[in-house]
Amino acid sequence: VRDGYIRRKDEFKFKCYVDGKDCDDVCKSEGGSAGYCTALGFLCYCAGLPDDKAWKPTSS
């Protein structure tokens, strides 16, 4: 379990909207405890994400 950017099948990082609701829902549906949308880059950042769902620098 880790905190980090969520990795999705169709994108290597999940883009989100400023309010973060979509990000929180996606993180929880993928096993995370919470999620928010970063202001820089509008990318979804998750807390408590399973290792296989988290983006790693070697992921694409």
Curated annotation (Swiss-Prot):
Keywords: Disulfide bond, Ion channel impairing toxin, Neurotoxin, Secreted, Toxin, Voltage-gated sodium channel impairing toxin
A Pfam cross-reference name: Toxin_3
Cellular compartments annotated: Secreted
Residues covered by the LCN-type CS-alpha/beta domain: 2-60
GO cellular component: extracellular region
InterPro entries the record matches: LCN-type_CS_alpha_beta_dom, Scorpion_toxin-like, Scorpion_toxin-like_sf, Scorpion_toxinL, Scorpion_toxinL/defensin
Positions of disulphide bridges: C16-C37, C23-C44, C27-C46
SUPFAM superfamilies per the UniProt record, alphabetical: Scorpion toxin-like
Biological process per Gene Ontology, one example term: defense response
Free-text tissue specificity from the UniProt record: Expressed by the venom gland.
PROSITE patterns: LCN_CSAB
Family per similarity comment: Belongs to the long (4 C-C) scorpion toxin superfamily. Sodium channel inhibitor family. Beta subfamily.
Role this protein plays: Depressant insect toxins cause a transient contraction paralysis followed by a slow flaccid paralysis. They bind voltage-independently to sodium channels (Nav) and block action potentials, primarily by depolarizing the axonal membrane and suppressing the sodium current.
Domains: entry comment: Has the structural arrangement of an alpha-helix connected to antiparallel beta-sheets by disulfide bonds (CS-alpha/beta).
Full protein name: Putative insect toxin Acra6
Species of the source: Androctonus crassicauda
